[in-house]
């Protein structure tokens, strides 16, 4: 086991504080509408330019191991805020830096660190309650667009795109961000249910110009089995032919003579048919077939529940207004399913999602909800260069997380104003002793830090503007983009309550641990042993050959 280097008391805290400040100073320059960029060198490829706090934090490793421990703890604040709300990483870092700096000053002045921490925790619990009272619901498209714009560093096109996507696929819908191919941002929306399975035979194609199969008002046969024998399908085919409608077959597989017969029937124009494999595998396939059945008001023909294909009737078929099948995807548009049944299925899947333990399962369940509840939107980010594309994509993803958080818990006034109002509201809060009161003051002072940093990044004097904002009422604050005072909510400067709350809670949690640190332990640096470079000189002995 390697020897350890141990530091105690003030020596340890000074080193740790230096690490905290290096990381926080690098991150906080990105805060606010006039935040600056940070350039990150990569070991391969072009440098990355970013205004995303957590991306900057993740890059920082310090040479001094004690300082690095401080930096890594603040990095944890940014990561936790990012995981919880997807945004607010820079705010969380600024809050943590302020609490640690003020807290360690109090410790150096002889305060009890444990009481300080208790005071900070008390203040944060009270502040979170006040934040919830200030919060207003975020439901209309305009507010959603404003939240997206603020989070994407005042990029209005991004905010509008996200609001448009949410309007089209609903709050439960899946919105993904991809790299586009042009210079403009684009929004693609797939309405209805789409899954990644294409037609089983190109002979089903009836729109050669697009290479797709389009079926208008088809019957949909759902079978949880392989179909290889045409005999068991004949009753269904005859009934469908009589009804004069097309038929879509979704089964585990359709092969052999069954597939050949379906192709022949289609080519002769006897009945319009298309067959696709059911999406997913194993239990997930069964669940997705059931989803499609509920969406189209059909029944899954499964031998597990005693239903046989030969005895299937038109009553068991699902129906939809339109189905489009390409070689890779199938889209069912406007299923005939009962709205109440679809809603109860969505509730059931949401319940499973909340209980799921793995991220993969959660993601798949969320996709199923989206497919049932509204659809899937893809935002394609456009940019002129690779570097700009990466930077913009990260911003759009942040903005998307922020708007989701806003829809979930509502919004408060942005620009650091909500925290200042909250700090004023808890001015009368008292702890059990004087040291706890100092802890409460430390937390209240920290709540001003985000506004001060936004103002500093805009090139103004933080104290002057902070005092003016403190003297104001309600949502009155300072708009750093236009350099004027006004109602933040009317100006469209909003922060999701969840983002502000998470930033404050995680910052206080980790800063509290740092204030109560009394000892730090790390490995001693290994001494480099001198290499045996001198031994190479022995090669000269080759000259002895001349002595022979």
From Swiss-Prot:
The lineage of its organism: Bacteria, Pseudomonadati, Pseudomonadota, Gammaproteobacteria, Enterobacterales. NCBIfam families: GroEL, PRK00013.1, PRK12849.1, PRK12850.1, PRK12851.1. HAMAP family: CH60 (MF_00600). This is Chaperonin GroEL. It catalyses: ATP + H2O + a folded polypeptide = ADP + phosphate + an unfolded polypeptide. It comes from Sodalis glossinidius (strain morsitans). Pfam families: Cpn60_TCP1. One of its GO terms (molecular function) is ATP-dependent protein folding chaperone. It comes from the Bacteria. The gene is groEL.
């Amino acid at each position: 086991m390697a020897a350890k280097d141990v530091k105690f008391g003030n020596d340890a805290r000074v080193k740790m504080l230096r690490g905290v400040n290096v990381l926080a100073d690098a991150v906080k320059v990105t805060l606010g509408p006039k935040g600056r960029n940070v350039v990150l060198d990569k070991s391969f490829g072009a440098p990355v330019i970013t205004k995303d706090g957590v991306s900057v934090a993740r890059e920082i490793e310090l040479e001094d191991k004690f300082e690095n421990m401080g930096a890594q703890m603040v990095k944890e604040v940014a990561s936790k805020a990012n995981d919880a709300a997807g945004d607010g990483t820079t705010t969380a870092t600024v809050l943590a830096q302020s609490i640690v700096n003020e807290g360690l000053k109090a410790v150096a002045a002889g305060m009890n660190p444990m009481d300080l921490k208790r005071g900070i925790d008390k203040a944060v619990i009270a502040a979170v309650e006040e934040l919830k009272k200030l919060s207003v619901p975020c439901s209309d498209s305009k507010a959603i667009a404003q939240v997206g714009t603020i989070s994407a560093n005042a990029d209005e096109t991004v905010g509008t795109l996200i609001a448009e996507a949410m309007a089209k696929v609903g709050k439960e819908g899946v919105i993904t961000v991809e790299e586009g191919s042009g210079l403009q941002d684009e929004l693609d929306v797939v309405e209805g249910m789409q899954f990644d399975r294409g037609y089983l035979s190109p002979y089903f194609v009836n729109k050669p110009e697009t290479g797709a199969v389009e079926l208008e008002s088809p019957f949909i046969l759902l079978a949880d089995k392989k179909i290889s024998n045409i005999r068991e399908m004949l009753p269904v085919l005859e009934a469908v032919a009589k009804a004069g409608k097309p038929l879509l077959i979704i089964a585990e597989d359709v092969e052999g003579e069954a597939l050949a017969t379906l192709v022949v029937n289609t080519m002769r124009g006897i009945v319009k048919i298309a067959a696709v494999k059911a999406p997913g595998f194993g239990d997930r396939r069964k669940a997705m077939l059931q989803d499609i059945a509920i969406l189209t008001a059909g029944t899954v023909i499964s031998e597990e529940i005693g239903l046989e294909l030969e005895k299937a009737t038109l009553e068991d078929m699902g129906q939809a207004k339109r189905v489009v099948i390409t070689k890779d995807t199938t889209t069912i548009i406007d299923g005939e399913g009962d709205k109440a049944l679809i809603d109860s299925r969505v509730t059931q899947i949401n319940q499973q999602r909340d209980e799921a333990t793995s991220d993969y399962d959660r993601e798949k369940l969320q996709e199923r909800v989206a497919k049932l509840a509204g659809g899937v939107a893809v935002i394609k980010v456009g940019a002129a260069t690779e570097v700009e594309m990466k930077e913009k994509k990260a911003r759009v993803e942040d903005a998307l997380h922020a708007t989701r958080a806003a829809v979930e818990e509502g919004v408060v006034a942005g620009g650091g104003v909500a925290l200042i109002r909250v700090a004023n509201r808890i001015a009368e809060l008292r702890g059990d002793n004087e040291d706890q009161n100092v802890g409460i003051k430390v937390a209240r002072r920290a709540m001003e830090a985000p506004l001060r940093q936004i103002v500093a990044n805009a090139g103004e004097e933080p104290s002057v503007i902070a005092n003016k904002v403190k003297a104001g009422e309600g949502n009155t604050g300072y708009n750093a983009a236009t350099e004027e005072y006004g109602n933040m909510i009317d100006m469209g400067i909003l922060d999701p309550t969840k983002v502000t709350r998470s930033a404050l809670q995680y910052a206080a949690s980790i800063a509290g641990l740092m204030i109560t640190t009394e000892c730090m332990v790390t490995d001693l640096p290994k001494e480099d042993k001198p290499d045996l470079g001198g031994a190479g000189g022995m090669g000269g002995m080759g000259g002895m050959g001349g002595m022979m």
